[in-house]
Amino acid sequence: MVLLGRAAETKRLDALVARVQERGGALAVRGAAGIGKSALVAHAVARASAAGLRVLTTTGVECETHLPYAGLQQLLYPIRADVELIAPRQQEALRTALSGADSAAPDVFLVALAVLNLVAEAAERAPVLLVAEDSHWLDPSTSHVLGFVARRLESEPIVLLATARDGASSWLDDAELPELALSPLSGAAAEALLRRHAPDLEPASRARLLAEAAGNPLALTELPRAAADSARGGAALPSWLPLTVRLERAFTARLSDLPPATRTLLQVAALNDSVSLAETAAAARSVSGDRAGTADPAGTADLEPAVAAGLIDVDRGELRFRHPLMRSAIHQSMTRPERHAAHRALAGVLDGQADRRVWHRAAATSLPDESVASELQAAAVRAERRGGIGAAVAALDHAARLSEDPSLRADRLLRAAHLAVELGSREVVTQLLDEAAQLDLSAQQRARVVWLRGSFDEGLHSRSTDTRDLAGLAERVAAAGDRDLAVRILWSAAQRCFWSEPGAGTRLYVVSVAEGLALDDHDPWLLAILAYAAPVERGAVVIERLGRLVPSQGHDARTDRLLGTGALMVGSFDLARRFSGAAVTGLRVQGRLGLLARSLGATAWSAAQLGDLSAAIPAAEESCRLGHETTQPYLYALIRSIEAVIGALRGDPDRVRELTAEAERVGLAIAARPVLARAQLARGMAALGGGLFGEAFSHLRRLHDPVDPCFELALRCYTVGDLVDAAVHCGRDGEVRDVMREMEAAGLRTPSPALHAGLRFARALLAEDSRAEELFLTALNADLTSWPFIRARTQLAYGEWLRRQRRAADSRGHLRAARETFDALGTRPWSDRARQELRASGESSGRRGPDARDRLTPQELQIAQMAAEGLTNREIGQKLYLSHRTVSSHLHRIFPKLGITSRSGLGPALGTGP
């Protein structure tokens, strides 16, 4: 049947289905209740089926939102046997998520990758249409998975169609998908639809109903029936009520004409979180007292009046309401005793389904009941084990409400808040902690409240005194015997020392508390806390201990991540890269994309500081993308500022301006010093590379001013060489003597490789001619094996100095070496400077042509690098959370960009092969 008034909408859906073989995608359909979303979906399903597509559907139901992966189970049921085709670790994650198998809790993103690959395998046989109706009622775990999948369909023969009601929050809000917003029908279409369903209406009644329906298709089909009922003596629906309420009342009014047994069945069905007719019939018999089922064992006869009235559909043992408003109308019309009776009856027929059973028990319970609360807590544990963190939060929250013991109630609220922090649900965390704070808490519970309140935004919105207070709290908690909690609290305090500047006294207090916890000398938490709180004062201790440790190569990713970030803070970028790289390996396997984004950011920053742009570019891009996807806005801003620094090193001033502006929109609003400092560094390095030395000095000088919002304690130590380079070239070297004295003093306290490499470079630049050569040679004779960028910059500066001393022949070897290194690293501005100096020395030097870093996008570069290492498309896809088909599509675009025809040409094209 043609959908009246929806020609443009159906055309768009038809095009989406028709081009699925060439290009996949997703579309969000939004609109008011009854506006025709389901009708459009039915049209798309019919077209897809006729075109040979496999159709997989799921529908959100309000009473299922607490069941982890309930929507996903429905969606994947027809292709469940294909799970054997995906990678073993993904198989395990998906089976654990869907069945609650006794296994380690899978990360939701690993489950999502498994789903993407499972559906992609199905699409190898026939293109797939995924349908998610009423997305606003899907459980949180399913929502996370669908959001992940929807963003990765462009290269797949898969289309995802999702619907959501206007004004209802859902995963579509953050998915950034193309949208189809349904408006009311035009006047002509509305009149045609009304004539189709009520051809005999009088003109006056027709005009009134058209005005009241306001172009809503469901209203145009249901309000005439309500009008007919009122004409037979029923109460008319007030025209001033909102349309949705009037429709619900219209459905409710139709219930009164049904037999009592039918009404009972519909009431139970409205509260059932399953479409199983057998469950509904058994529970309805329990409510009515006919437990033996002597009247109508299957319930089918009692349902016939509801089917005839157009309220429900019954097919193959499944009962479905024709529209969600019918379900909500029945629910709203029930009294509390009726709802409790229906829930108790449903709980009674769900033996062997512990999670569903306890939620029905809970819904039938108004007063505190520890037995139900304990069952809900057990359900939370099961949900968490399956990766259903949102469901676990809901179960613990409800368990707290039903707890008889106030202390248990507090523990459950605090555990729920802790899990909600993992989800990034700030409002939920605040609500749970506010409830907990009203109870008579123990000292430890109060400490957990304080700690959890500061878990968002790295303490950016707190006062500077809060860092000291947090350290004091950790000290008291440790004294009370809970060292693990004390460490977590102290780690929060240490992170605040990075994101803000609490002052030297507070930093050293954090150190004092940490060193008083009697942790093992090589404990990763201790080393990370010391590095964040006192990168100079405890730099020697951290670097010495880090040097004794070996990365786990993915076996202990959390430890590797902590050690990698600690190494960053103390300026040991070579160690940072080693530990962070190991963390990336482990976190990829585990599917922990939130932490993976952070470790990739650390990898990008360390690689950029070492000058390895081939590693820094893709790591930063992936970190930024995952930071956005996992809702980490401050990390996203930080990585944007790091990308700006990379842009400066590549010689792309337009990109630097774009990225610094984006980073500072967040950084300035929250006074995030690391973001502002790196944005300023990017500006300074862009100017330095472009030969604008005075401008570079002005930008870089701000990093060393303690009252400037761009001041960051650790970063200033590792940029002293940049500042002096700019100062010397613009004749302002006298203005950096004070900074040099401070940095020399810092160098006496820490063996930081970055600080000492910068100091050696700076000393040579500032030296009188009589000492300059000695200091340049000292700088070059240091072990800079892992630091090619600073070595090449020193060679460039030495060559410049030699040429100014009229030793052109001596300068050329250093200038050539610098040029070759800069070319290899991709730091074009410094390559150009080396070429200029070579030409000034009397040696010609042609311009470097573009390489793979210039021709490929960051993600293409990353895929090309992995393929050059010998990884298969499937292996690359598993690492990057893409399907193998998407990887293949990328490679087909990469080959012509690099002028090659096969994978064997990747190594030479990237400069990594023979």
Where are these regions (language model features)?
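Short secondary-structure boundary elements
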Residues: 74, 189-401, 727-734, 897
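Sensor-1/coupling segment of RecA-like P-loop NTPase cores
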Residues: 145-179
